[in-house]
Regions:
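Active-site rim/loop-helix segments in enzyme catalytic domains that contact anionic ligands
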Residues: 2-144, 170-174, 229, 247
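The feature marks non-catalytic terminal segments
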Residues: 2-3, 8-26, 108-114, 143-144, ...
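Histidine-centered beta-alpha loop that forms part of the nucleotide-sugar donor binding/catalytic region
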Residues: 63, 153-154, 181-183
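Active-site environment of divalent metal-dependent phosphoester hydrolases
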Residues: 68, 95-97, 124, 156-161, ...
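Short aromatic-enriched loop/helix-cap "lid" or pocket-rim segments at secondary-structure transitions
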Residues: 72, 99-101, 162, 188-193
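Short beta-strand segments
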Residues: 87-90, 150, 179-181
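Proline-aspartate-enriched helix->loop->beta-strand connector
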Residues: 114, 137-155, 161, 165
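Conserved beta-sheet core of the metallophosphoesterase superfamily
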Residues: 160, 164, 168-171, 175-178
Length: 256
């Protein structure tokens, strides 16, 4: 089933092609199972689609699985709680070394409530694949109108992170772009944007990170360390908890 916007914002059309026959059959079966008139179910589905399109949308660029959760997991939890639609792109899952990382990332994304996709770029070789990464971001920018994009800070010293952020700056020129901190990769960073968080957001962030059993050996996965960072950022904002960001670009009209 392919949705198409009509001439007016409130008008939606759908077309059925051979490729989507199974979707249409599923749609009819759903109506039958619920003893519901197809036209009523279609009306409800259209209404749901319109409401979803009205949601503010955030995209999180995660060079490796776990970067998104480490850098802005609490903020993701808060945005979703407030009705935002959040999508994350994991660019590398290191499948050759840790095949289970894919499942870990999927479970983490589900806990936070965000949609996700997992790509298969080779870790440490993002500079070589820069053009392919640029194209992926370009395609996303054409497909969705994001209000907010998260990416590693511009001073992140990891080469993979640097490529993702550089290409994000090229592509996402019409929306707010914030750089999330990963302290072990940031020797010099200016955090000038802080998002206040509640304890429940931090709990969800840590629960999501606990899915990454393969990564728990790293010092930055220590629960006390994770809590100390959000507490420190909270002190800077005079609030119990916060996550800090580098303001790369702000477009206020899309955030209000």
């Amino acid at each position: 089933m392919v949705w198409k916007k009509g001439k007016k914002p409130e008008q939606y059309l759908f077309t059925i092609t051979e490729e989507f026959t199974n979707d249409w059959n599923t749609f009819k079966n759903k109506a039958s199972e619920n003893n519901q008139n197809i036209s009523n179910l279609l009306r409800n589905t259209v209404s749901s689609k319109i409401n979803n399109d009205k949601k503010k949308k955030a995209l999180v660029l995660s060079p490796h699985t776990d970067d998104a959760e480490l850098g802005c997991g609490g903020t993701i939890a808060k945005l979703i709680e407030e009705g935002w639609a959040v999508h994350v792109i994991y660019f590398s899952a290191v499948r050759t070394r840790f095949p289970q990382l894919v499942n870990e990332a999927e479970n983490s994304a589900r806990i936070l409530g965000m949609s996700y996709e997992i790509l298969d770029f080779n870790t440490r070789y993002f500079p070589r694949d820069r053009q392919d990464i640029l194209q992926i971001l370009h395609d996303h920018s054409r497909k969705e109108n994001y209000n907010l994009v998260f990416t590693p800070t511009t001073t992140d010293i990891h080469q993979d992170h640097g490529v993702v952020t550089t290409e994000a700056k090229r592509i996402f020129r019409k929306c707010t772009l914030l750089g999330y901190e990963l302290p072990w990769n940031n020797l010099d960073v200016s955090l000038n944007c802080f998002i206040p968080l509640e304890k429940r957001h931090i709990k969800k962030k840590i629960s999501a990170l606990e899915c990454y059993n393969t990564q728990k050996k790293h010092p930055y996965f220590d629960k006390k360390f994770l809590e100390s960072v959000v507490k420190m950022r909270g002190v800077q904002l005079s609030t119990p908890f916060a996550e800090g960001f580098e303001t790369i670009k702000v477009r206020l009209d899309q955030l209000i």
